Amino acid sequence: MGRVISFANQKGGVAKTTTTLNLGVAFSEQGLKVLLIDLDPQGNLTMSQGLNPDSIERSMFDVLVHRLPMPEVIHHAEVDLAVSSIDLAGAELALSSMIGRERALEKSLAEVKANYDYVLIDTPPSLGLLTINALVASNGVIVPVQCEYLSLRGLVQLENTLSMIRENLNPHVEIEGILPTMYDSRTLHSREAVEILEENFGELVFDTKIRKTVRYAEAPVKGTSVLKYDPSGNAAEAYRDLAKEVLNGAQAREHA
């Protein structure tokens, strides 16, 4: 049964989509079967695989709202991808009147989860119903955090949301790790931000840091991951390192 990981942070621009895609491809390089789910109405994960969300007829909106079987919206790209479309912008309103609205994704995942080792979910930059659906369906959460002070403050709100979900909807969801992104070792501000994270969250902070580089912006323009775009570059190696950390954590949990 696949392990489900959401990438969540209500602040935008923290590399959620970049991390979802590139970690998924790094897992795939290890021989693991991976499904990515684009739960963000902006559709950036879908676009990063060369697909146009505006021209997609059936998407995660139809899965969540109309109970369309998930295999019908999975495209086979670098890894399998359940796509977003512009319609997903209306999903929160449509879900709000439905019974069991927080579990729509969990129910849809049940039919495909066994086919994968990992299911990775890209969430919108909010803590609304789409993100809550992702967290309810997840075993773990990876929190990408930009290495600046204002980004750190949003972690408290996310922790509060996770506590509410544990109490009422999914007692087993846990923070898989906190990932420093946009890291620039040359600046004191970046280094201090990582220190603050480590002081407050200890071993939850990944050793891997995702550094600032234009490679992460260039790869989606080509409709591909950075691991395919620049396979031997530092940007690709960072996500291979992250994959090793996540897999080592999974092994540690199994033997705990």
List each language-model region with its residue ranges.
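P-loop NTP-binding core
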Residues: 1-256
